[in-house]
Amino acid sequence: MLLSEASSFTAREFVTVLGRDGVVVDAMSSVRAPIARFSRYCRAIRRVPAPSQDPLGYLAATDRLMTSGEYDALLPTHEQAWLFSAGRHLMRHRVEVADIAAFDRVESKIEFARLLDDLRLPQPAWRLVEYEDDLSGLDFPVWFKAEFSTAGRGVLRV
């Protein structure tokens, strides 16, 4: 099994859970000492370009590893899943991830809120703010969120 990254706590948990079940796990990383490296269940860290700095190089390195015959499966753990979907036409090895349209629908806070509305699932009241006039009638305090952000970045309480 090859993990798409090795620096997150998510990757560390995957390594532990899979390793305890006897799965041989390697992980890709652009840094020398990612957290997964310190698990007894991680056999190797495969150095690859950083997907944020060289997405094409990262896809090419992933494709080389997956077509080497050494791995039965690739497990995307974070944003790399989106990159594999967007770049699937550049890879010989097929990575089983959702189509890019599905990612766009759930990764955009606006599109996700619309999806919840379409499905009639409960969520806090929300409004798209594009112009200053869109602010009228808001009950403060409010939270403003960037359409795309992660881990609390792009969030402002006013």
Task: List PLM regions with ranges.
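ATP-binding N-terminal substructure of ATP-dependent carboxylate-amine bond-forming enzymes
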Residues: 1-99
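Active-site nucleotide/adenylate-binding loops and adjacent lid/helix of ATP-dependent enzymes
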Residues: 103-158
